């Protein structure tokens, strides 16, 4: 039996494929490579010494997707594929509803047709909106503030309705916080385009000289140093969280929602100083105006994942920094050969 990974060539998807292969799962990948690169999958095979089956397919193409289920004995699906830029979603919401929500409907329709009813869904902590208290538990009220987050919430609700209609489905919804770092080999990592939206690739691109300085958005928040605090989690810990959720999903018929985070927040300047300490480099920065909608502090309560999945984040901030820098140093131009720019794989 095989595990189908949608968006498996993306940042989180490729790291999860490594952990699946290391756990002796057979892996089948569907990816349209609109914001990922087949080279990532070549390197996954290089790291693990195992082969993976890859289909270059858009999830909206149900006929092609059916072929994947016809040609493979699929036991469960881990669903990463989707657009992920908050700013872009505000400018082009219809694109996000099509590529995130409609594509998931297409996927679930085909899954149901072929009686594959185990799915792990890659959601996001963006569904929580502005927290009133901390840490953030899974029972927090949902308050999405942009079309990207809205697609995640709508998919979560849709999956709940699917389960209510047919309790033979088993569904795990993973809400994770801020993945950073890279595989310790330095062969795969976050291959961002232009000026990154995320902190760590921004830092590494400044450190390597591709960008002039780091923009720190706001230094007057009510935090220890005035900069925003987030829950940063090593991407390999996050990948292992997906494997843990997969095991439970296959064993149980239920809907489970889990935060994946470290349970500790670090400020922007704390991450910057940790990176400088781990690499013996100095990263120039300037303070800019806060971004609209940003909150001061945001971190997870991951107790449920520990109790029910037996999962806990293990890697330190220092390891996250060292691994991210190793990836950037070994791959200054990312995976080099990009087919086209978009945002469809995690």
Explain the meaning of each model-derived region.
Residues 1-182:
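N-terminal Rossmann-like NAD(P)+-binding domain of SDR-like oxidoreductases, especially those catalyzing
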Residues 38, 178-198, 209-230:
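Short, flexible, glycine-rich and Lys/Arg-enriched loop motifs at helix boundaries
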Residues 57, 61, 195-196, 264, ...:
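Residue-level signature of the cytosolic catalytic core of signaling kinases
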Residues 97, 145-153, 189, 193-197, ...:
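Short-chain dehydrogenase/reductase
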Residues 202-346:
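C-terminal substrate-binding subdomain of Rossmann-fold SDR/epimerase-dehydratase oxidoreductases
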């Amino acid at each position: 039996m095989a595990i189908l990974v949608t968006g498996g060539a993306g940042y989180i998807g490729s790291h999860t494929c490594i952990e699946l292969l290391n756990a002796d799962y057979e892996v089948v990948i569907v990816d349209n490579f609109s914001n990922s690169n087949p080279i990532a999958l070549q390197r996954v095979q290089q790291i693990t010494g195992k082969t993976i089956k890859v289909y270059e397919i858009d999830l909206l193409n149900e006929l092609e997707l059916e072929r994947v289920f016809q040609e493979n004995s699929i036991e469960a699906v881990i669903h990463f594929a989707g657009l992920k830029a908050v700013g872009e979603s505000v400018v082009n919401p219809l694109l996000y509803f099509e590529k995130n929500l409609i594509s998931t409907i297409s996927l679930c329709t085909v899954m149901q047709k072929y009686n594959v009813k185990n799915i792990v869904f890659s959601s996001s902590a963006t569904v929580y909106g502005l927290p009133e208290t901390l840490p953030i538990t899974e029972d927090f009220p949902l308050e999405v503030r942009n079309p990207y987050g809205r697609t995640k919430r709508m998919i979560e609700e849709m999956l709940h309705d699917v389960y209510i209609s047919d309790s033979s489905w088993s569904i795990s919804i993973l809400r994770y916080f801020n993945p950073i770092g890279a595989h310790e080999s330095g062969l795969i990592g976050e291959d961002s385009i232009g000026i990154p939206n995320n902190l760590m690739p921004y830092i590494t691109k400044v450190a390597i000289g591709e960008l002039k300085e780091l923009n720190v958005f706001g230094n007057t928040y009510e935090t220890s140093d005035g900069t925003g605090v987030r829950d940063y989690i090593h991407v390999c810990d996050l990948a292992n969280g997906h494997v843990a959720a997969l095991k439970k999903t296959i064993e149980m018929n239920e809907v489970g929602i889990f935060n994946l985070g470290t349970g500790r927040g670090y400020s922007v300047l704390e991450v910057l100083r940790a990176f400088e300490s781990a690499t013996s480099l100095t990263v120039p920065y300037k303070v800019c105006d806060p971004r609209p909608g940003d909150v001061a502090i945001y971190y997870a309560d991951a107790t449920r994942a520990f109790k029910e999945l037996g999962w806990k984040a293990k890697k330190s901030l220092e390891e996250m920094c060292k691994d991210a820098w190793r990836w950037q140093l070994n791959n200054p131009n990312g995976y080099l050969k990009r087919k086209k720019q978009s945002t469809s794989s995690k």
